[in-house]
Amino acid sequence: MATTSLDLAKVRNIGIMAHIDAGKTTTTERILFYTGVSYKIGEVHDGAATMDWMEQEQERGITITSAATTCHWPLEDNDYTINIIDTPGHVDFTVEVERSLRVLDGAVTVFDGVAGVEPQSETVWRQADRYGVPRICFVNKLDRTGAEFHRCVDMIKDRLGAVPIIMQLPIGAEMDFKGVVDLVRMKALVWSAEAAKGEMYDVVDIPATHAEAAEEYRGKLVETVAENDDEIMELFLEGQEPTEEQLYAAIRRITIASGKGDGVTVTPVFCGTAFKNKGVQPLLDAVVRYLPTPLDVEAIEGHDVKDPEVVVKRKPSEDEPLSALAFKIMSDPHLGKLTFVRVYSGRLESGTAVLNSVKGKKERIGKIYRMHANKREEIEAVGAGDIVAVMGLKQTTTGETLSDDKNPVILESMDFPAPVIQVAIEPKSKGDQEKLGVAIQRLAEEDPSFQVHSDEETGQTIIGGMGELHLEVLVDRMRREFKVEANVGKPQVAYRETIRKTVERVDYTHKKQTGGTGQFAKVQIAIEPITETDGPAYEFVNKVTGGRIPREYIPSVDAGAQEAMQFGILAGYEMTGVRVTLLDGAYHEVDSSELAFKIAGSQAFKEAARKASPVLLEPMMAVEVTTPEESMGDVIGDLNSRRGQIQAMEERSGARVVKGLVPLSEMFGYVGDLRSKTSGRASYSMQFDSYAEVPRNVAEEIIAKAKGE
């Protein structure tokens, strides 16, 4: 059995990011085919793609789970290991994307050559900016009617604010697309019609028809590189032409550096058509040439277990103590629970004990696997910089840190958004009851954006997620993987409540002093709205002095206020954006207790919230509709009728794009209405934007319904 200490300079941990349908899974499939892992090319069209291994993904033709796959690629006499994290492109699964980005060193962003930069492309681009992930771009589908390489490059510049370095020019357009001009080597790469799977291509002189454009764009390439790299700038100013090697090295430096700073992202752009097997091998060369190794990435930062203020750094070396992040949990039908782990420092060995430093619990490492999309290879140990799947972790959930128990560290935790949509779910029979509990527990372990609670009044189980598709897929998985038959209610919007006014003082005394052990707690609190846009959902400030309330009771007041926030004043929805200040209080030597102060905190909060002008908030979705011009009036009218606010309109490749903010509650069933209004020619995407106050007339209806009036 293999034990692996890879040469980290020859490792690339990459993700492939894109908008749904840009051809991301097809591109990944081709990469796996050309790197020799997959002997048959899996097509998304016929549901056979290797990465899309969950049944629902194969039916829907979209990628839901980021499966980690290891493959190998030779370049210039070296063999490189590429770990690919396949990320979903549908907005309901942005949590998966965030989680994958956290463990990547670099990424390939795939764009649809016809549609260009689409809404979800912007979302994942911004997420990659936030995590400082260096990127290269691949403009795909150049064989399609309406594909325009240069328009797509302009959109990368204008809509993403990036600086593209055009590395290739297409040879031929649409159906006649047959290869690319390599602007560094100044050669043409042409795929012959005979090699149906595109495994062979010829490196030839640039055709005369493309010579002038090649010269022009080669000049632009050198200029862009010079503007971003001092070494090439010196050559440029001296009038010297850089060599291939100098350009490769400079583009690598620029690509890696642009992920680190807060400056503009500079990104090499390649092109091809994955479906027609053209342009994928040069893309693999580019992954190796330009994307960072684990050694290029700065030391991972975490914090001390006892003191979150103390920063702890770990270099990507096997000599450092172990630090690893669990970024994905999956249920394998044969192996049970698998935890996908990125090792940042030290070594992870099968059969050893490690510490889950978030929970303070010891875990035993079972078998370690290198995963292909749906096949596996067992290894004994794994070193820094690698990504593997581990068996045997019982307590570890997504986003938690595994470390050496003598040198514990907590790596930066991931914050996941609260669900915006909920449905009630109940088992069809007694036999399904237990299975439903197991299914929900497993799915919640795998997916932190999937949340579960019981409705105290109805006793129903409520599940929440990031959108209708997200919940559909989860319910579908319950049925297929856990054999649970369940009735699912209508989707409900996750409203919130907040306050608009500051209440400077509310006194509350909790007293029960008749017979038996008494209870006594007196608190005085103030509450105010948290107005900062990125402020916390809740904040507790303690201003009690002189021991008026003993220190051990203060957290109970905080806990009581937080408990009261779970069920708002108006309609019982969770409250958000409230700062509670504990000003004063009193206690009794015998009768005071943690429980008494918790009750006092809870009741004082409720009283204060009633006086603080409570309002209802609703999730607003950023909606983008692409429609033929003749249907534009109908589309805008329809969005207005749904209480939408139109924010922008633009033209994109012959169609009109309408952007707006629309309440989620008004968007149920929108796909059918849009189809009928535009004869099926329009498409839309939406994602959560923010919470906004509900207009009074609508709020009154929601409140009345919640109270059962």
From Swiss-Prot:
This is Elongation factor G. Its main location: cytoplasm. GO terms for biological process: ribosome disassembly. Keywords: Cytoplasm, Elongation factor, GTP-binding, Nucleotide-binding, Protein biosynthesis. GTP binds at residues 18-25, 86-90, 140-143. One of its GO terms (molecular function) is GTP binding. Catalyzes the GTP-dependent ribosomal translocation step during translation elongation. During this step, the ribosome changes from the pre-translocational (PRE) to the post-translocational (POST) state as the newly formed A-site-bound peptidyl-tRNA and P-site-bound deacylated tRNA move to the P and E sites, respectively. Catalyzes the coordinated movement of the two tRNA molecules, the mRNA and conformational changes in the ribosome. Coiled coil: none annotated. Belongs to the TRAFAC class translation factor GTPase superfamily. Classic translation factor GTPase family. EF-G/EF-2 subfamily. The keyword Transmembrane does not apply. Residues 9-295 form the tr-type G domain. GO terms for cellular component: cytoplasm. It comes from Streptomyces avermitilis (strain ATCC 31267 / DSM 46492 / JCM 5070 / NBRC 14893 / NCIMB 12804 / NRRL 8165 / MA-4680). The keyword Transcription regulation does not apply. It is found in: Cytoplasm.
